[in-house]
Amino acid sequence: MKKLIGKKWLLLKAVATFLLSGCASLEQKAQDSVKEVTENVTQTISNDQRIPADFVRHVDGDTTVLKIDGKEQKVRFLLIDTPETVKPKTKVQPFGLEASKRTKELLSTASEITFEYDKGDKTDRYGRALGYIFVDGTLLQKTLVSEGLARVAYVKEPTTKYLAELEQAQEQAKNESLGIWSIPGYVTQRGFSK
């Protein structure tokens, strides 16, 4: 009888060991799958990778809708602010229409549009993707700032990859009194005064 119990106990141990090793194997496979998916997503939205995009529709000077990875996304341009044209309960601000038209013109005539995330948040509180837009290889934000149609704004670490470049362009636009800089006192730390 003891021999029979011992054999049953041994058999039970063997079955338990087999099952546990199978579970561990399944758990490891699941972890490997999760890791692989995470790595693929991370590669897709790498901080230094420009993602091909298509222009869908225009919103205003610093916001647009692009098709990225086959999905339409509202995109807010990082590190800049243009005068308002579509904000509820806000009058159209000076140079807002010019900034809006210029953004639409550049995006609608581009041969190639690419989108790049920076470090930090990938979306804002409104669900808009946050990033840099390149039109035919040129940083769209820099074009708008250089032409006096946008100010450098919403600077938050670690989202500062092109900050120095944009600040340099802004300084030149200021010195030449272009666009928003042609109205004394119009540009403030908090936006635009009129």
Show where each model-derived region lies.
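Small beta-barrel nucleic-acid-binding modules, primarily SNase/OB-fold domains
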Residues: 2-13, 19-194
